[in-house]
């Protein structure tokens, strides 16, 4: 009897020290007492009550209405106001104040290297109850930026190119931050996020109650973060490169035994990397990130196809855009070695055919799970296979004519063909043009000699 009394007292003292329950039911003392009474009767249910308390706190924080700074209509460019105030607009259901409000955590990882929107080491946090993904300053302890989980539209986990040690970039693309779809007037926009984790176990990852996780179980930091995100995302799942979609013809520059999933490209003068994924085409890792979701792509075509490089043109239409509202992105100086792989990817998903754009929008690849990826790839492959042999032959003939027109310039006098962004590309174009000129001269000479022979025989 005395042992039972001591055990019950210890349990009661332990339960009274649970911070999550104290915070969640501070305004409801009678309900808090009932929770502690239940824990005293069934101490094995302490984790359950703690989770319920954390979820309750997250709901209270989410529905709180902290004061917001008013936004003047003529204060300045919309993009600048969004950067300064994190898109805080009167009347929004979510605000930056909500993101920064105190809330119980489900997971956090210290010393995470962020590249976007700030380049510094911060603490990555996931609040309980599918609340927010955010980054906290490790010195001031203030939340620097964040995004509600239900506003995230795409999450990518991509190997960092050209590194001697394996690393992974997590790219968070919220709604209206993909570089394609502009927000409606007055709509709040959250910034994209990019952070890096190394290959190997997590060194400073913790659950919400402060218990270290990711050590001793063989789970890498990349797998741990990916699992936590998948458990909390509501509209999507983490997407990774898949060699069934695309793999580069060239291996990793510093790890020759590993396959590379990226292609180097330029958008204007800005260098970046293209990733061809199961849900769309990504260009990063510098601001602004661009994600070409399948449902936004009107068509994909090639330009300036030279001996060593070519350009990729992607025509897109926003979700809320009309039929004629399209925008074209040119990604240049792509290595010819990856032409076959990229072309196979484009045809697999029917991206070269603008007539399939409506079908892609109707399909809306909105769930990125493994089964959805395979089904989507199979559907797009079937659509691409419907192209008739006549259409295929006509398209190939037109492509060949376009290449001949680009490569042959009888009045060039050594001027560079194509985009002109690289001297090497210009030299390649000249060399190829010289080869074509030489080939045409040989054909003309051969035909001329045959005509002379016929004339002599007739005489």
Curated annotation (Swiss-Prot):
Coiled coil: none annotated. It is found in: Nucleus; Chromosome. Residues 64-96, 370-459 are annotated as: Disordered. Residues 398-416, 424-440, 449-459 have a biased composition (Acidic residues). One of its GO terms (cellular component) is nucleus. GO terms for molecular function: DNA binding; histone binding; nucleosome binding. Keywords: Chaperone, Chromosome, DNA-binding, Nucleus, Transcription, Transcription regulation. Disulfide bonds: none annotated. Interacts with histones H3 and H4. This is Histone chaperone rtt106. The lineage of its organism: Eukaryota, Fungi, Dikarya, Ascomycota, Pezizomycotina.
């Amino acid at each position: 009897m005395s042992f039972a009394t001591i055990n019950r007292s210890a349990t009661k003292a332990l339960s009274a020290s649970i911070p999550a329950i104290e915070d969640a039911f501070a305004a409801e003392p009678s309900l808090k007492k009932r929770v502690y009474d239940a824990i005293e009767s069934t101490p094995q249910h302490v984790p359950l009550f703690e989770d319920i308390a954390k979820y309750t706190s997250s709901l209270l924080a989410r529905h709180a209405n902290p004061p917001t700074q008013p936004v003047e209509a003529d204060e300045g460019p919309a993009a600048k106001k969004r950067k300064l105030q994190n898109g805080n607009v009167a009347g929004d259901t979510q605000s930056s104040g909500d993101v920064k409000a105190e809330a119980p955590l489900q997971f956090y990882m210290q010393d995470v290297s962020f590249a976007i929107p700030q380049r510094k080491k911060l603490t990555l946090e996931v609040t309980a109850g599918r609340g927010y993904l955010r980054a906290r300053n490790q010195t001031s302890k203030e939340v620097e930026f964040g995004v509600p989980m239900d506003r995230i539209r795409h999450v990518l986990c991509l190997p960092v190119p050209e590194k001697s040690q394996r690393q992974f970039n997590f790219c968070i693309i919220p709604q209206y931050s993909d570089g394609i779809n502009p927000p409606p007037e007055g709509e709040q926009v959250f910034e994209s996020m990019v952070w890096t984790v190394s290959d190997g176990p997590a060194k400073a990852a913790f659950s919400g109650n402060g218990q270290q996780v990711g050590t001793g179980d063989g789970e890498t930091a990349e797998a741990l973060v990916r699992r936590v995100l998948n458990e909390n995302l509501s509209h999507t799942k983490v997407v990774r490169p898949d060699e069934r979609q695309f793999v580069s013809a060239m291996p990793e520059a510093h790890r020759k035994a590993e396959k590379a999933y990226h292609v180097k490209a330029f958008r204007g003068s800005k260098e970046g990397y293209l990733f061809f994924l199961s849900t769309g085409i990504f260009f990063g890792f510098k601001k602004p990130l661009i994600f070409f979701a399948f449902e936004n792509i009107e068509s994909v075509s090639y330009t300036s196809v030279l001996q060593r490089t070519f350009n990729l043109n992607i025509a897109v239409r926003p979700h809320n855009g009309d039929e004629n509202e399209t925008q074209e992105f040119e990604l240049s100086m792509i290595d010819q070695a990856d032409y076959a792989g990229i072309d196979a990817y484009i045809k697999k998903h029917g991206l070269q055919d603008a007539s399939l754009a409506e079908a892609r929008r109707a399909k809306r690849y909105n769930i990125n799970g493994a089964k959805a990826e395979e089904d989507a790839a199979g559907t797009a492959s079937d659509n691409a296979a419907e192209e008739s042999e006549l259409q295929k032959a006509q398209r190939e003939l037109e492509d060949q004519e376009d290449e001949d027109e680009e490569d042959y310039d009888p009045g060039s006098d050594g001027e560079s063909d194509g985009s002109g962004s690289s001297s090497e590309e210009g030299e390649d174009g000249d060399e190829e043009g010289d080869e074509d000129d030489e080939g045409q001269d040989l054909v003309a000479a051969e035909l001329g000699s045959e005509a002379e022979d016929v004339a002599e025989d007739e005489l």
